[in-house]
Amino acid sequence: MTRGPIFLNVGISYGLPRTKLPAAVSFRKWVAATLQGRIRKADLAIRIVDEKEGRALNYHYRNKDYATNVLSFPAQLPEPLPKALKIPLLGDIVMCAPVIAREAAEQGKSLSAHYAHLTVHGTLHLLGWNHEDHQEADAMEQLEREILANLGISDPYLEEY
């Protein structure tokens, strides 16, 4: 476990109007909570997209013809890392605002809590976590619960939120 201050560069871009979206500072807080104790320096990008862009990306990269809530693209860096790279590049997270809003409403969650959960989820993917089988999924979900609890956010996997 890595302790100490985190140096974090989170670039956020929007592919749609920013209405009803969390502030950039919120995304940075959620990423920092995920990285705490795991990594001290990181550079990543978060892009908030509409359904059309979300669907196109999901089709292009996963061959699934629908928009999904979050996609993570871990950075593919050469080994050894270039000396000029002072902050490790983690990768990119793409979040589809209409899907996230729809899911939050269907699940009775606050929009902010759902964005927090999916930001944590996407960041964990950038760190190498997956949910390809039940064991991996259980471990990842437990870690998400712990991180979100530290942020004061309820268990996102409860049936009633």
From Swiss-Prot:
Which cell locations does it reside in? Cytoplasm
Protein EC: 3.1.-.-
Gene3D superfamilies, per this entry?
Metalloproteases ('zincins'), catalytic domain
Principal location:
cytoplasm
**Pfam families in the record, alphabetically?**
YbeY
Q: Which GO terms describe its molecular function?
A: metalloendopeptidase activity; RNA endonuclease activity; zinc ion binding
Q: Which InterPro entries match?
A: MetalPrtase_cat_dom_sf_prd, YbeY, YbeY_CS
Q: Where are the transmembrane segments?
A: none
Q: Which cofactor does it need?
A: Zn(2+)
Q: Which residues bind Zn(2+)?
A: 121, 125, 131
Q: What is this protein called?
A: Endoribonuclease YbeY
**Species whose genome carries this gene:** Xylella fastidiosa (strain 9a5c)
Q: What is the lineage of its organism?
A: Bacteria, Pseudomonadati, Pseudomonadota, Gammaproteobacteria, Lysobacterales
Q: Which gene encodes it?
A: ybeY
